[in-house]
A protein has these predicted regions:
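C-terminal auxiliary extensions adjacent to catalytic cores
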Residues: 1-184
Length: 184
């Protein structure tokens, strides 16, 4: 049709971005796993009495599930094409589907990072009286303004929502930057 509206370049970029973000979330989940597994001097599942309570086990499960969902969402949309418009459009980029999948991967990654944030904040409490760097302590303070230290099992919905908001808004980076100066 010579409309020059073929979306393949955008579709390729969106698919590639989704793959990169999914990998980033996967690395975050692995760090979360290491915080809850009890092998680094931290209590298993980040609760003092974790044998009777599941602690941060379920949030880590949720993060692992989101990482697995992202893997399935990362099949490139741009490699799928079906003729449309009575064959006039013989190669379709599927870029709109790629954009929707990329958005879902981003949303899942934000939640995975939020779980890591919750676990990291909890783990810092077990290392006291030691202090982390100024930027980490500032970010920890921003987390603790919205999410309390856990001593027992409770539902995580409100905490996860608060942590996701902190990740999505950039508030944690902003808090750290108040101590460190601008971050890249």
């Amino acid at each position: 049709s010579a409309g020059n509206f073929h979306g393949q370049p955008l579709a390729l970029a969106l698919d590639t971005a989704a793959i990169a973000i999914a990998e980033w979330a996967s690395i975050s989940e692995r760090r979360t796993y290491l915080l809850v597994d009890g092998s680094d001097g931290l209590p298993p599942f980040l609760l003092e009495r974790s044998g009777l309570q599941s602690g941060f086990m379920i949030p880590q499960y949720a993060a692992a599930a989101l990482v697995s969902e992202n893997k399935t969402l990362c099949h490139p949309a741009c490699v799928d094409s079906i003729p449309s418009s009575r064959g006039q459009e013989d190669h379709v980029s599927m870029g709109a589907w790629g954009a929707r999948k990329a958005l879902r991967v981003i949303e899942n990654a934000e939640r995975v990072l939020a779980v890591e944030v919750l676990c990291a904040a909890q783990s810092l409490e077990f290392r006291r009286p030691l202090r982390a760097g100024r930027g980490v302590e500032a970010a920890h303070g921003a987390i603790r303004e919205r999410v309390a230290y856990r001593t027992e099992d409770l539902t995580f919905e409100a905490d996860l929502t608060a942590a996701t908001d902190l990740v999505r808004s950039g508030a944690l980076v902003a808090a750290a930057a108040t101590e460190t100066g601008p971050l890249p």
